[in-house]
Amino acid sequence: MALLPILEFPDPRLRTKAALIEAAEVTTPAFQELIDNMFLTMYDAPGIGLAATQVDVHKRFMVIDVSEEKNEPHVFINPEIVAKDGGRVYQEGCLSVPGIFADVTRADTITVKYLDRNGQEQQMEAGDVLATCIQHEMDHLDGKLFIDYLSPLKREMVRKKLAKQRKHVA
């Protein structure tokens, strides 16, 4: 297994819309290894979710584990939200936008259809942090970042803060 490099804003590859995955690809050894590497990368970061587009793989899947013990891994392949309910503000962060946190309003509960890592169709109802994380990671698959929900002024402040952080690292 190997850690994968995580793309960071403003990298234009984060804006690429991910392609659907053929069911036959899901069970291939190469795809299974990619899933394992994404979990390894997410846990190492540390994070609670990682979309394939964040590691420069433009396919519609993501890995998530919101448990404290990191023992409830979920793989969502070709996810599709089929129902939403309520609205709630959560403070979000992102491995591709390091050190930045902002309040984002999302559906409080969702129902999502997807393929699991074995290529089996699944449907899950999710609430709270898991629902927020699924919606956040699905945005990545459509080339959208949580900072896109911010006003243009706040988004520009984020861009400047990240540029300043990069200067200090270099």
From Swiss-Prot:
Listed under catalytic activity are: N-terminal N-formyl-L-methionyl-[peptide] + H2O = N-terminal L-methionyl-[peptide] + formate
Cofactor(s), names only, from the UniProt record: Fe(2+)
Q: What class of enzyme is it?
A: hydrolase
Q: Where does Fe cation bind?
A: 94, 136, 140
Keyword Endoplasmic reticulum assigned to the entry: answer is no
Q: What is this protein called?
A: Peptide deformylase
The gene that this protein is the product of is: def
Q: Return any one Pfam family short name.
A: Pep_deformylase
One biological process GO term for this chain?
co-translational protein modification
What does it do?
A: Removes the formyl group from the N-terminal Met of newly synthesized proteins. Requires at least a dipeptide for an efficient rate of reaction. N-terminal L-methionine is a prerequisite for activity but the enzyme has broad specificity at other positions.
According to its UniProt record, the EC number is 3.5.1.88
Q: Which residues form the active site?
A: 137
| Entry-linked PANTHER family | PEPTIDE DEFORMYLASE
Q: Which domain of life is it from?
A: Bacteria
**Molecular function (Gene Ontology), one example:** peptide deformylase activity
InterPro entries recorded: Peptide_deformylase, Peptide_deformylase_sf
**Keywords on record:** Hydrolase, Iron, Metal-binding, Protein biosynthesis
Entry cofactor note text? Binds 1 Fe(2+) ion.
Provide the family line: Belongs to the polypeptide deformylase family.
